[in-house]
Amino acid sequence: MSKIKVLFSTANDSKVLYPHLYGPNGTSEAKNSQESNDYLTDAVFQYLKNDDQFEVYECPWMVHMYEDSPSKKEDLTGYGFTLRKQVNGTPNLLSVDEAIQRIQAKEFDYVVMDSRTVNPWWNQRGLSPFFDNTVKILQTVLSCYPAEKILFFDGEDQITVIGGLVGKVTYFKRELQFDHPLIHPIGYCFPEWKFRDASPEEKTKDMATVIPGDKSTYLFTDENSYYEDYRTSRFGLTWKKLGWDCFRHHEILFSSCVPVFPDIKDCHPLTMTHYPKELCAEILDCGVVLDGYYKHQQYHDLYCFNNVRVDFSKISREYYADLLGRLKDHALKHLTSKKMVEYILSKTN
């Protein structure tokens, strides 16, 4: 059986490919600025590279995804935990001209593009150095492939969409807040092989170390310690960032930790549709989260919560075990990379 050929034409402000962006004369603030990697694109890419059914091509190189690449973990979003610097093997790299020729020959079953690469907003700020090539590739793809063969991931924090592409691609929107027959809701996903199981008896403390927005609690620079902290904690704090979906929500679940999500009831029904929002609301209502927490603005529309506390004695151990079991079951049934890829492909029929 022949493999499914997929071209990823997605790019970011890679420090390896575009070092001129960084430093005192670059458009990024400083040399220690992290790359703006997209979690959704990277999670799907990682899964397809690990599944023998797919033959994955790249234009440009997804350099930050490969274990033996020159990318440095400290330069990547979230130190590269879970997704980046973890793919083995040789990349199938194509030049822009080669990619265009193969697209014109219709060699690919699917072409993946994303808003991080296509959206002029990034280019206008000097953070999309592949943009001119992207325009050429996108024009070729649109002229050669039907919408069901073009997978477009809009992982922007804003609720707006690129209207000119709707109907011309299979459009997936992360922060979706309006119903449209040609736009599909989507959220982040997590590699199933990274799931860490834990029983209630293995928990050693009530609350995980990280408090979102409090940089003094961002202590972890290695993946194992970070996830073990969640795995051995009964609860983990999380809430909306600039957009509703946030990889931290998933890190908590896939570490067998119960998320305390104070603003979950404000999330739009079409946003985070795969996430267990009802269970998160149940956690707020069961009595374990104490009254007195409050929201404060950090800047623009980014906010945090203060004084979020739990009292484990307010619920029974049996209820906690049942709740944790339901959350883990939901995560493995709906939020793995495999399940998200199946969902994506189901929308191309």
What residues fall within each predicted segment?
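Nucleotide-sugar donor-binding catalytic core of glycosyltransferases
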Residues: 2-321, 325-347
